Each structure stands twice: as structure tokens, then as C-alpha cells.
């Protein structure tokens, strides 16, 4: 089954995490690149001009802001992170950003999905052509959401103890292994000593 872009957020016995996966049929020539306190989705070498064909394919997918990790499938990662940095709570930062930026105006009306987590709470959200949803993530029950098919948060058993394991898991572990067209993945993991980042490729 093809889910498009996928993100997961939550806590397990090892710590807190956000994870993100690019699955793509139209623009598979992409990679994830770690920068300072962020991970960017960018075209691979030789395909840089793809951004002129589709403005939605390059963006920061993860941002770290203090004790908070933000993850999304587009430029709203930065909008949410900036609001969190100014002191806005996670629910409102996600909700206002999704409402303002709306779904992507491409041929498929691709939804924008997002999540954020800190030491005390986590929220996940989506905006589609039909509406907006932001909900609290249950404590110790990780959830995931995607741009297609799984457009509501779904509980998942997320087996990871590091950012490397989290990126690997959303790319091809557990139930995620059944989802088609994986390209690249990234994750942030906090084991109590702060956030660390990692990426994985197919």
C-alpha cells in the first residue's frame, strides 16, 4: 500500500522520538541531510532542478527547538518551530500553522501533516481539502499518520532506542515494511540526554 509521506511520534521505553519517511512515485530522487538541529529533504545530486517542477519536494522535515522536536512533510516544519520558539504551546503551533498554510495545491491536494513532542506532551495534526485535525498523542502510545490512506493517527509499536534505529524502523521496520516506494527517512531521538538526529536511505 502506498501512503506517501509518513511521520511517527511518541515515546517508548527507551525515550521520545519523531520519525519521518519520504515515499514517492513521482520524485524518488531525494535524500535527507542533517544540518544544525534540523534535517532537510533535498534532491540528490544531478536532480537539483526538480524543485522548479514541484516546489513542495524540498524542505526541513525535522527541527529541534530547545526540548521540542518538530516533524512535518513540508515548509510548515519551520512555521511550527518558529511559533514554538516564541513560546506558543504545541497544539496551537501545529493548528495555526496548518490552518494558515493549508493543504498543498498540487494535483492530488496533498495534505500537510505535522507533529511535535517535548518532555511533557505531544501533538499530531493534518490539514486536508476537507478539514483540519490536531490531537494529543497518548502517553507511551506512539502514533503515525500519512499523506494518503492513513490520514488519521494510528497507534503503532515503534521499536527504536536511537535516532538511527528510529529512521531505519520507519523506513522498513515493523508494519512500515509493507508500505511501498520508500526513498529516505530521518529521525530525532531523545533518551533523556537531549535530541540526536539520524538519517537512513533505501
Swiss-Prot record:
Coiled-coil zones: none
InterPro entries linked: IMP_cyclohydrolase, IMP_cyclohydrolase-like, IMP_cyclohydrolase-like_sf
GO biological process, any: 'de novo' IMP biosynthetic process
Bridged cysteine pairs (disulfide): none
One term of GO molecular function: IMP cyclohydrolase activity
Keywords recorded for this protein, A-Z: Hydrolase, Purine biosynthesis
E.C. code: 3.5.4.10
Superkingdom of origin organism: Archaea
Reaction(s) this enzyme catalyzes, per UniProt: IMP + H2O = 5-formamido-1-(5-phospho-D-ribosyl)imidazole-4-carboxamide
Keyword set includes Mitochondrion: no
Pathway membership, UniProt: Purine metabolism; IMP biosynthesis via de novo pathway; IMP from 5-formamido-1-(5-phospho-D-ribosyl)imidazole-4-carboxamide: step 1/1
Family (UniProt): Belongs to the archaeal IMP cyclohydrolase family.
Function text: Catalyzes the cyclization of 5-formylamidoimidazole-4-carboxamide ribonucleotide to IMP.
Protein name: IMP cyclohydrolase
Source organism per UniProt: Methanothermobacter thermautotrophicus (strain ATCC 29096 / DSM 1053 / JCM 10044 / NBRC 100330 / Delta H) (Methanobacterium thermoautotrophicum)
Designated gene of the protein: purO
Amino acid at each position: 500500500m502506498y501512503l506517501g509521506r509518513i511521520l511517527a511520534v511518541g515515546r517508548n521505553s527507551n525515550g521520545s522520538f519523531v520519525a519521518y519517511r519520504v515515499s514517492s512515485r513521482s520524485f524518488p530522487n531525494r535524500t535527507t541531510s542533517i544540518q544544525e538541529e534540523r534535517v532537510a529533504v533535498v534532491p540528490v545530486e544531478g536532480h537539483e532542478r526538480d524543485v522548479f517542477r514541484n516546489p513542495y519536494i524540498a524542505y526541513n522535515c525535522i527541527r529541534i527547538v530547545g526540548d521540542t522536536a518538530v516533524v512535518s512533510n513540508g515548509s510548515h516544519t519551520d512555521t511550527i518551530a518558529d511559533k514554538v520558539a516564541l513560546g506558543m504551546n504545541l497544539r496551537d503551533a501545529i493548528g495555526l500553522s496548518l490552518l494558515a498554510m493549508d493543504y498543498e495545491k498540487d494535483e492530488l491536494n496533498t495534505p500537510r501533516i505535522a507533529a511535535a513532542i517535548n518532555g511533557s506532551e505531544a501533538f499530531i495534526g493534518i490539514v486536508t481539502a476537507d478539514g483540519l485535525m490536531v490531537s494529543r498523542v497518548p502517553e507511551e502510545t506512539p502514533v503515525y499518520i500519512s499523506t494518503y490512506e492513513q490520514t488519521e493517527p494510528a497507534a503503532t509499536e515503534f521499536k527504536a532506542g536511537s535516532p538511527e534505529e528510529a529512521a531505519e524502523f520507519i523506513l522498513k521496520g515493523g508494519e512500515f515494511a509493507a508500505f511501498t516506494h520508500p526513498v529516505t527517512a530521518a529521525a530525532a531521538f531523545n533518551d533523556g540526554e537531549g535530541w540526536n538526529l539520524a538519517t537512513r536511505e533505501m
